[in-house]
């Protein structure tokens, strides 16, 4: 299971280092009869002579070109190559020029099928299972991350999907408009079994469903962890939620201010007007910064 770097000649193993969650999802979905090796190219040099039957590569657009080069190299050696991730999901035909099969969207319900099909010599070109059942979210083995300390944050996910359909964003295309939640008990399980203390929630909006967020934050309090995540600017409207997030170990939030240009708002669907943005920023400065550190950004077009 491989996560490519963008450029193998420019390693950036400084600052906030987050491993590719997709690799650990695939590892958890793989039947025990198979041996799995995770290769984060950020830290591990690829061995093209590795004895293996299947090579699975997960990539974004930023590292897709590198991922394709890796795929081509392994295929030349007769290995079966499967590619997935955001970029291949949106451009599966392009990805198929470099792979034997492409996973479109989520891995649950797909990866197991791929392994069975390979064993039975029935591998298909494209695999896609929309809306997989996240109630059976498989445990992740993060123990090696905690022991080796190559990465300083362990990735977690509590939800997928987003009700907003902003022009610039691929989340809705990949995961749909409906927010799907991973049971809180499963999230707590992964945290406890990881042995780590520092985490990042990869959810696009950690408070996308307030009832679930309260349940999650409450369950995190006794775990004594530190975490950062992403949220919509509406977090500023709920002081009690901010306090609960702080108690649960929140140390920082990344909040997107997609645009400060009134005419662009139709592209993002989150804010009704520039005045909404101004009011929310004032609330953040007055309230949110009392509890947690905030980082903001906006999209430049």
Question: Model-derived features: where do they sit?
Answer:
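Acidic, low-complexity intrinsically disordered segments
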Residues: 1-194
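Structured beta->alpha junctions
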Residues: 59, 63, 87, 103, ...
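Catalytic cores of alpha/beta
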Residues: 92-97, 241, 300-301
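Radical SAM [4Fe-4S] cluster-binding motif and immediate context
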Residues: 138-287, 291-292, 299
């Amino acid at each position: 299971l491989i996560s490519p770097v963008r450029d193998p000649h420019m390693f950036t193993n400084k600052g906030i280092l987050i491993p590719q969650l997709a690799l650990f999802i695939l590892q958890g979905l793989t039947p025990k009869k198979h041996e799995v090796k995770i290769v984060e190219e950020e830290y591990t040099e690829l061995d093209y002579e590795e004895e293996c039957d299947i090579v699975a590569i997960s990539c974004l657009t930023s590292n897709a070109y590198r991922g394709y080069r890796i795929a081509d190299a392994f295929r030349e050696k007769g290995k079966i190559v499967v590619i997935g991730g955001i970029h291949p999901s949106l451009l599966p035909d392009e990805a198929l020029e470099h792979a034997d099969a492409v996973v479109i969207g989520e891995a649950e319900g797909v990866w197991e099928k791929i392994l069975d099909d390979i064993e039975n010599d029935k591998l298909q070109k494209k695999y896609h299972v929309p809306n997989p059942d996240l109630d059976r979210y498989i445990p992740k083995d993060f123990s090696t991350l905690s022991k080796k300390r190559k990465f300083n944050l362990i990735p977690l996910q509590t939800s997928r999907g987003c009700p907003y359909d902003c022009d610039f964003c691929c989340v809705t295309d990949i995961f749909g408009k409906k927010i799907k939640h991973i049971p809180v008990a499963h999230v707590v399980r992964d945290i406890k079994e990881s042995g780590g203390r520092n985490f990042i929630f990869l959810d696009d909006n950690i408070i996308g469903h307030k009832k679930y967020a309260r349940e999650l934050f409450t369950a995190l309090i006794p775990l004594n962890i530190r975490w950062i995540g992403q949220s919509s600017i509406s977090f500023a409207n709920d002081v009690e939620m901010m306090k609960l997030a702080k108690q649960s170990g929140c140390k920082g939030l990344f909040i997107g201010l997609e645009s400060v240009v009134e005419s662009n708002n139709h592209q993002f669907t989150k804010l009704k007007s520039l005045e909404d943005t101004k009011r929310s920023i004032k609330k953040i400065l007055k309230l949110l910064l009392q509890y947690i550190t905030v980082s903001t950004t906006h999209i430049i077009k």
